[in-house]
A protein has these predicted regions:
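General structural signal for secondary-structure boundaries
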Residues: 12-16, 116, 168
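Cysteine protease catalytic domains with a Cys-His-Asp triad
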Residues: 1-87, 93-104
Length: 168
């Protein structure tokens, strides 16, 4: 892997997926979706979305499978582009051992607000949670942590794993 010889090399989709899949195994109540492009919700034909798993997400189905924690890592580029910057979303729904309250959290290591596509997803999950009687709070990181252009993937992984490991 390039990053083994070049520590400034960006993590790619496969690197991030490989790490996060290990956490899905370690935490059976955790569902990871991604990494996904920012246009995940866009229709590409025949009623399909760029990322159907996320476009058609149903909180009730996740909860029925015992998945009360959800992590998503997004790239700000569209699926037809090469990739620019990683951001993440964490969602935790009532009934987990770490919290009686639910929350949806957005993370951008530059402290920028979420893109409209992510806001739509967060609102969709919030609405579904409320309908199921599990209201959630939405929290958005506004503090900048990253000042170079090589760490965003690592920050996203750390953000999600901090919740999973009880550090957040």
């Amino acid at each position: 892997k390039k990053w083994e010889s070049n520590p400034r090399e960006w993590l790619n989709t496969i690197d991030i997926r490989d790490v996060m899949n290990q956490y899905e195994v370690k935490h059976p109540d955790f569902e990871f979706i991604g990494p996904v492009p920012m246009d995940f919700d866009s229709k590409v034909g025949f009623g399909k979305c760029v990322i159907n798993e996320l476009c058609n997400i149903k909180l009730e189905s996740l909860l029925e499978k015992g998945k009360r924690k959800l992590g998503v890592i997004f790239n700000l580029d569209k699926h037809t582009q090469s990739g620019s910057h990683w951001v993440a979303m964490w969602a935790q729904f009532p009934g987990t051992e770490t919290s009686s309250d639910g929350e949806i959290c957005y993370w951008d290591s530059y402290g920028m607000r979420p893109n409209p596509e992510v806001v739509v997803l967060m609102n969709r999950l919030e609405s579904q949670a409320k309908t199921l009687g599990h209201p959630v709070a939405i929290n958005i990181n506004k503090r900048r942590h990253q000042y170079k252009n090589t760490e965003c993937g690592v920050y996203c992984i750390y953000f999600l794993t901090s919740f999973l490991e009880g550090r957040a």
